[in-house]
């Protein structure tokens, strides 16, 4: 058996398999990518033991825990742990603080003939390590913000750069009012953990300058860490440009063709299209106050007609109507205003090819 470990850096850099012995309610609030939740106690059992601990102390709580997790219940859980351990011989187990729960799981595994290491300090210590990783990256590394009008393909540029930090990808959201995906967003803690691991791996590869897309503090329901967002407000900006026509086509592909395919892939043909249509309509409704009544109704009529035609024939051409209106009358004026306020920070502007080349060359200067 490997020794118990507190080398959190190595655990995350090497994507070491981990088994989380916390209760499901704890796991759902925040965990690490790829980790499997195989709890010692379920939520109800944990609550009972916690209440007992507060009222009668640790010894009584431990005794109650053994009474609740015994017999067939214990056998089934141990069997699941053994299966995980044998499938992941290089893995580790942990609980919240690396205390009694993970020690109990480790001991019961040993009784079943399996020696398996645990992570010292548990989830709490690993979470602290990742928060420190975020802080160190923000304070020690250079940042460049990639800005541009809606539909210029900022994410396309960002994801092709070795030093690109894709906040929207980590948040599973495109960042705009229309940005929700067919699958949900991670919990806030999961978002932060994934972001920190991303930074850790890139820095381990020698990257000390990061390019981030110009985002508001919220990417859907995920908050960009305050320290990172504040740093983004003062760093240099590179502005991506493209023609209105190209931007319309890119938005048509991303927010209509690809999003519809996403929903159908997840939910099936009939239900998927209905949910896709509802999502588009709701996204437009979410900004109806900012659009104003007349403009909202006009764009809504165009969107409804386009959706009806798409459902009838599969054709998506009519969607260009509301996309052109939304860009020209809403997003472009808003982004033009933002660009004006960032003008002093913009150090380069160009098309995708030019911006990609500039950012690649810039990253080699440090």
From Swiss-Prot:
Rhodanese domain: residues covered: 12-135
Residues making up the signal peptide according to the UniProt record: none
Classification via InterPro entries: Rhodanese-like_dom, Rhodanese-like_dom_sf, SelU
PROSITE patterns: RHODANESE_3
Catalysed reactions, as listed in the record: 5-methylaminomethyl-2-thiouridine(34) in tRNA + selenophosphate + (2E)-geranyl diphosphate + H2O + H(+) = 5-methylaminomethyl-2-selenouridine(34) in tRNA + (2E)-thiogeraniol + phosphate + diphosphate; 5-methylaminomethyl-2-thiouridine(34) in tRNA + (2E)-geranyl diphosphate = 5-methylaminomethyl-S-(2E)-geranyl-thiouridine(34) in tRNA + diphosphate; 5-methylaminomethyl-S-(2E)-geranyl-thiouridine(34) in tRNA + selenophosphate + H(+) = 5-methylaminomethyl-2-(Se-phospho)selenouridine(34) in tRNA + (2E)-thiogeraniol; 5-methylaminomethyl-2-(Se-phospho)selenouridine(34) in tRNA + H2O = 5-methylaminomethyl-2-selenouridine(34) in tRNA + phosphate
Top-level EC class: transferase
EC number: 2.9.1.3
Gene Ontology process terms (BP): tRNA wobble uridine modification
SMART domains documented for this protein: RHOD
Gene Ontology MF terms in the entry: transferase activity, transferring alkyl or aryl (other than methyl) groups; tRNA 2-selenouridine synthase activity
Keywords: Selenium, Transferase
Active site residues per record: 95 (s-selanylcysteine intermediate)
UniProt family annotation: Belongs to the SelU family.
Subunit organization: Monomer.
Primary role: Involved in the post-transcriptional modification of the uridine at the wobble position (U34) of tRNA(Lys), tRNA(Glu) and tRNA(Gln). Catalyzes the conversion of 2-thiouridine (S2U-RNA) to 2-selenouridine (Se2U-RNA). Acts in a two-step process involving geranylation of 2-thiouridine (S2U) to S-geranyl-2-thiouridine (geS2U) and subsequent selenation of the latter derivative to 2-selenouridine (Se2U) in the tRNA chain.
The protein's name in its UniProt record: tRNA 2-selenouridine synthase
Classification of source organism: Bacteria, Pseudomonadati, Pseudomonadota, Gammaproteobacteria, Pseudomonadales
């Amino acid at each position: 058996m490997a020794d118990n470990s507190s080398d959190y850096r190595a655990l995350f850099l090497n994507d070491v398999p981990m088994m989380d012995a916390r209760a499901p309610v704890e796991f759902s609030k925040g965990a690490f990518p790829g980790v499997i939740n195989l709890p010692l106690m379920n939520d109800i059992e944990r609550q009972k033991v916690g209440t007992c601990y507060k009222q009668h102390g640790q010894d009584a709580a431990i005794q109650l825990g053994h009474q609740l997790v015994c017999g067939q219940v214990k056998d089934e859980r141990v069997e699941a742990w053994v299966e995980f351990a044998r499938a992941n011989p290089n893995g580790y187990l942990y609980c919240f603080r690396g205390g009694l729960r993970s020690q109990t799981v480790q001991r019961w595994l040993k009784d079943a003939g399996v020696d398996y290491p645990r992570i010292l300090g548990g989830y709490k210590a690993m979470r602290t390590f990742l928060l420190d990783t975020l802080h160190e990256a923000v304070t020690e590394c250079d940042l460049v913000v990639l800005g541009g009008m809606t539909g210029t393909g900022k994410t396309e540029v960002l994801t092709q750069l070795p030093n690109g930090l894709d906040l929207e990808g980590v948040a599973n959201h495109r960042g705009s009012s229309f940005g929700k995906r067919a699958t949900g967003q991670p919990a806030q803690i999961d978002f932060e953990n994934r972001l920190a691991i991303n930074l850790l791996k890139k820095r381990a590869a020698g990257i000390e300058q990061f390019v981030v897309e110009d985002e508001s503090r919220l990417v859907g329901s995920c908050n960009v860490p305050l320290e990172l967002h504040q740093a983004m407000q003062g760093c240099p900006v590179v502005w991506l440009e493209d023609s209105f026509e190209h931007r319309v086509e890119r938005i048509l592909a991303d927010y209509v063709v690809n999003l519809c395919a996403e929903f159908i892939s997840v939910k099936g043909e009939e239900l998927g299209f209905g949910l896709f249509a509802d999502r588009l309509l709701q996204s437009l409704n979410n900004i109806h106050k900012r659009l104003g009544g007349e403009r909202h109704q006009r764009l809504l009529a165009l969107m409804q007609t386009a959706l009806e035609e798409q459902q009838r024939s599969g054709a998506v051409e009519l969607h260009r109507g509301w996309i052109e209106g939304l860009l020209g009358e809403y997003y472009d004026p808003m982004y033009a205003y933002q660009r004006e306020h960032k003008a002093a920070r913009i150090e380069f502007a160009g098309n995708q090819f030019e911006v990609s080349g500039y950012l690649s060359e810039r990253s080699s200067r440090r």
